[in-house]
């Protein structure tokens, strides 16, 4: 907590521009401790993201009880969305759930144009995956930002 507060203070950046991505394992390990820290981060203005939603033991109660600003749909659903009607139905409903709760939803693992198109048709507006770029070193990322 203090480390995040110090980093925000040192950088001079608005805490609302910072999003911390949490995995389910953080919540399962010590729920009471995690909840307290999450509420404190939220009070500072930090946005919280629930990673890999739909995989593992992620519970809908997390979305009800915890101050998440966004959730990321696990790639297990987006990977098969074009060929698997069940995956498409689950993804469509997770997108609707996010809209209804006022939570941004990011589709992870988008690697092909047909996945991107179908997710867009379902109302998805935020995407992550190799279709848009591969992981890169910080120097390469800076160069990409300044290149026309």
Model regions: which residues?
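Structural preference for long, well-ordered alpha-helical segments in enzyme cores
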Residues: 3-7, 37-38, 94, 114-116
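Phosphate/pyrophosphate-binding loops at sites that engage ATP/ADP/AMP, CoA/4′-phosphopantetheine
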Residues: 8-14, 80
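EAL-family c-di-GMP phosphodiesterase catalytic domain
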Residues: 17-32, 44-148
């Amino acid at each position: 907590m203090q480390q995040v507060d110090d980093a925000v203070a040192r950088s001079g950046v608005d805490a609302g521009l910072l999003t911390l991505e949490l995995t389910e394992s953080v919540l399962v390990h010590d729920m009471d401790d995690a909840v307290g820290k999450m509420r404190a981060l939220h009070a500072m203005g930090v946005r919280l993201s629930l990673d890999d939603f739909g995989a593992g033991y992620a519970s809908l109660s997390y979305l009800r009880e915890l101050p998440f600003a966004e959730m990321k749909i696990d790639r297990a659903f987006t990977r098969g969305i074009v060929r698997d009607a069940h995956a498409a139905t689950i993804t469509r409903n997770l997108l609707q759930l996010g809209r209804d709760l006022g939570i941004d939803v990011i589709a992870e693992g988008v690697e092909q144009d047909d996945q991107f198109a179908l997710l867009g048709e379902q109302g998805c507006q935020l995407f992550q995956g190799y279709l848009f770029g591969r992981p890169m070193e910080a120097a390469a990322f800076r160069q990409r930002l300044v290149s026309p």
